[in-house]
């Protein structure tokens, strides 16, 4: 075989390359296993590796809540096609529970972070509704569950919040 055939850019042959096993053995020889665990303050943890999972003690968010300012309603009240007119019966503020009951063809003005009133499964953002006195006109195409953050959506209680080895 000619020298140009052995050392061509079209060839995978490299006489100086390590085999996969040789490379793995070299990497293993350079590692120093961590033999101890220690508890450190969070401010001292930068650059450290977790020895075990950190488990979330509670859900984040703690409760279902509105992701947007808008109107909380029951998806079942929306027309299959076309717009729907609903009566606004109150306001749900963040940090407060709406005390009223939402009936058929009713909705509640809701702020970001507020708990959806009982029975309401959808939040329609304020930018797409048309306000007409104490009623709103909701356009077609709204999906059940839209704009509602579910309890535990970011972190679920009892599940790893941070994984070991990271």
Language model features with spans:
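Short, low-complexity N-terminal leaders and the immediately following helix N-cap/first helix
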Residues: 1-80, 150
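Short, glycine/charged-enriched hinge/interface segments at domain edges or termini
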Residues: 2-15, 71-166
């Amino acid at each position: 075989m000619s020298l140009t055939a052995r050392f061509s850019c079209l060839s995978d042959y490299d006489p100086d390359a390590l085999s996969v096993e040789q490379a793995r053995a070299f990497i293993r020889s350079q590692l120093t296993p961590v033999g101890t665990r220690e508890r450190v303050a969070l401010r001292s943890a930068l650059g450290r590796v977790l020895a075990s999972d950190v488990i979330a003690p509670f859900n984040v968010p703690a409760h279902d809540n509105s992701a947007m300012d808008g109107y909380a309603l029951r998806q079942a009240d929306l027309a299959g096609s076309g717009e729907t007119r609903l009566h606004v019966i109150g306001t749900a503020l963040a940090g407060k529970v709406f005390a009223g009951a939402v009936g058929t063809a009713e909705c509640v003005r809701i702020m970001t972070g507020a708990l959806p009133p009982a029975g309401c499964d959808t939040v329609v953002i304020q930018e797409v509704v048309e306000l007409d006195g104490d009623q709103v006109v909701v356009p077609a195409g709204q999906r059940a569950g839209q704009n509602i953050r579910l309890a535990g959506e970011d972190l679920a209680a009892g599940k790893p919040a941070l994984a070991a080895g990271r």
